[in-house]
């Protein structure tokens, strides 16, 4: 239990390392700066200086945190309590604790459950406000992603560190009915159910039905076949149906953004996802770089609008 408490303590220190606004009861403590009238106290600076003892960096960090907290408070963003419940439960589980043990561990650290929940809520709101402020500034093109992904893959190969990534490719055929003024959801679903029944009963074949009825004319001319592809290349609902379908079994009618479908998985094989994996890594690197830059720019913008005063800097 002591080890679990130590692990949890480390987690709490990392998770809840937000600015602790010092009680105004410490009236005799020296004020080193103010941010829109909010004081920055000497004890806060000492608590944030760390081993390097960089006083100015500590003051700037506190000021930035105050500005972000103000932006959060002014945003009006609300967090669903159920989301906080989930995070609390997940935190306990990841630390190998029951809910009761987790509460005991919090108490051991001198932290009430309400305080812990409020800290989580503050961080979630802060993230939402920040993301809303900077999301429009993120601009990553497909060309940039592909080029960087290929460069990263080539470097990994030359260094002998490239690892092959595989995933399931599915061979799929489908029949699509598109909605129109003469065909609503109920009618399309009913028609596809009838087509499915006829195929299963042997009254027609999937290929013939696709050629006759499918509004995906390209695949319809090929018996409804879409060939082999990774599920991620399809619309979400289509991909989900592909993955959960048993090979050789025609799915029930389902709807996507394109219309109503039935599909059949006719083959499964392992495909090479190595290039795609490095493309994803490249995308994450580019986005994270821009995100950090945008975050810094956002905080700088908050500073420009704020009234910041230093005393005995």
Curated annotation (Swiss-Prot):
InterPro entries for the chain: OMP_Chaperone_SurA (IPR050280), PPIase_dom_sf (IPR046357), PPIase_PpiC (IPR000297), PPIase_PpiC_CS (IPR023058), SurA_N (IPR015391), Trigger_fact/SurA_dom_sf (IPR027304)
Signal peptide: 1-27
Sequence ranges assigned to domain PpiC in this UniProt record: 167-267
Top EC class, one word: isomerase
Cross-referenced PANTHER family: CHAPERONE SURA
Catalysed transformations (reactions): [protein]-peptidylproline (omega=180) = [protein]-peptidylproline (omega=0)
Its EC number(s): 5.2.1.8
Protein name: Putative peptidyl-prolyl cis-trans isomerase SurA
One Gene Ontology MF term: unfolded protein binding
A GO term from the CC aspect: outer membrane-bounded periplasmic space
Keyword Isomerase assigned: yes
Organism the protein comes from: Haemophilus influenzae (strain ATCC 51907 / DSM 11121 / KW20 / Rd)
Function field: Chaperone involved in the folding of extracytoplasmic proteins.
Compartment(s) of residence: Periplasm
Keywords: Chaperone, Isomerase, Periplasm, Rotamase, Signal
GO terms (BP aspect): chaperone-mediated protein folding
């Amino acid at each position: 239990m002591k080890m679990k408490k130590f692990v949890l303590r480390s987690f709490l220190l990392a998770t809840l390392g937000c600015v602790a606004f010092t009680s105004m009861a410490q009236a005799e403590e020296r004020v080193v700066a103010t941010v829109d009238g909010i004081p920055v106290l000497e004890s806060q600076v000492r608590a944030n200086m760390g081993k390097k003892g960089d006083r100015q960096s500590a003051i700037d960090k506190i000021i930035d945190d105050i500005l972000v907290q103000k932006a959060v408070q002014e945003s009006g963003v609300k967090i669903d309590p159920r989301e906080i419940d989930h995070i609390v439960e997940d935190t306990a589980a990841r630390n190998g604790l029951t809910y009761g043990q987790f509460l005991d561990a919090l108490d051991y650290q001198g932290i009430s459950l309400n305080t812990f929940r409020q800290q989580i809520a503050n961080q979630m709101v802060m993230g939402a406000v920040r993301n809303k402020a900077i999301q429009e500034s993120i601009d990553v093109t497909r060309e940039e992603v592909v080029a960087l992904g290929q460069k990263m893959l080539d470097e990994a190969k030359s260094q002998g560190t490239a690892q092959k990534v595989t995933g399931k490719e599915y061979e799929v055929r489908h029949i699509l009915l598109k909605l129109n003024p003469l065909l609503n959801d109920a009618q399309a679903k009913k028609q596809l159910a009838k087509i499915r029944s006829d195929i299963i009963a042997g009254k027609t074949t999937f290929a013939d039905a696709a050629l006759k009825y499918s509004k995906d004319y390209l695949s319809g001319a090929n018996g409804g076949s879409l060939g082999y592809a990774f599920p991620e290349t399809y619309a979400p609902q289509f991909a989900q149906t592909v993955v959960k379908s048993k090979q050789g079994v025609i799915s029930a009618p389902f709807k996507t953004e394109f219309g109503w479908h039935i599909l059949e998985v006719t083959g499964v094989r392992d495909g090479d996802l190595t290039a795609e994996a490095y493309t994803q890594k490249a995308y994450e690197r580019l986005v994270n770089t821009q995100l950090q830059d945008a975050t810094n720019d956002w905080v700088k913008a908050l500073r420009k609008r704020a009234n910041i005063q230093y005393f005995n800097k």
